[in-house]
Amino acid sequence: METPLKEPESSLESYNEPSSCTSERDVTAQERAKQGEELLAQLHRPLEACTNSCYCKQCSYHCQLCFLKKGLGIWYARQGRRRRTPRKTKTHPPPASDKSISTRTGDSQPTKKQKKTPETTVVSACGLGH
């Protein structure tokens, strides 16, 4: 007598077991929840000092402090570069009294000296003779 061939039972068992897709979905949902919690924890953590002085796009988004400093272009600290000279210090030399007023005020138009030419004297002389 021949023994009948048995069908593999594993194929039937796979239909009865829950699919692995649902377990993968649960794992990814848990990972996302953990990432969200880590991000919230990082937001509430005080900012650490960053010594990166480059202003390229990659370095601007390096960390939260770099983004606040470089990415937004807003700087809340005092900047020493824009200091003006104190008012007590005189930047201009005292005006000399022998100079004319136009020279002190800085008129850019020079005064023209009129030269008498023989033609103008001849014309006026002819006018008197008539």
Swiss-Prot record:
Pfam families: Tat
Location of the region described as Core in the Swiss-Prot/TrEMBL record: 67-77
Mod. after translation: The phosphorylation by CDK9 does not seem to be important for transactivation function.
Region Disordered: start-end pairs: 1-33, 78-130
Biased composition (Polar residues): 11-22, 99-108
Miscellaneous remark of the record: This isolate is from a Gambian case of 'neuro-AIDS'.
Protein name: Protein Tat
Organism name: Human immunodeficiency virus type 2 subtype A (isolate D194) (HIV-2)
